[in-house]
Amino acid sequence: QCVHQGDGHRGHDGTHECSVCASWWWSGNLTPGIHIGTDGTPGGYGIWDVTGTDFQCLYKSTGWPEEYQFRSYDLNNVHFSMADVPLMPSDISASVKNAYMQYVNAYPQNNDNEVLINIWNWNSDWTLSVVDENRKTLPYTEVWAYDPLHIAALSVKRFNNAGLKSTPSFITDKFTHFFKVKADDADTDLVITVTTIYGFLFLN
């Protein structure tokens, strides 16, 4: 027996049924068009298809097609530094500065040719495949990570505040539904395929 429960507020991690408010609307307010939760999940809701005892579900991101189930990042082009928050007071407490530094430490400038994949509705029964342009299958590692888009769209903007006195709310959290692969070189194209337990196939 499986019980599915919906919650209409912000959601993160695990299998999403709904995450309408994302970061309680903060990300879209600070960066128009970027409505995502603290783990990078787009604001959205679950679609349930029930026929007799047969049940299928899919997370639907608001304003996106059903096929939008993950986001990938070329980490050669993702990095954060103190230069991104010039308005942060120089005398801010160590605890507040360290809260921001977790993003700087997670994403320093590098050329390691790594790609981070955020599959926000990941389930252990799903499968992931990453193949490069030479048809080489690349191994992946499941990692805890911060979503770079949420950092840029919300956390950086909350910390870049001359009136900052404490750690802002709803900043980017570290979550488990991330995967990392390493390409042979910086210019290699990748085909990322995610297959759900119901056989739905998503490509990028």
Where are these regions (language model features)?
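Aromatic sugar-binding surface patches on proteins
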Residues: D147-K182
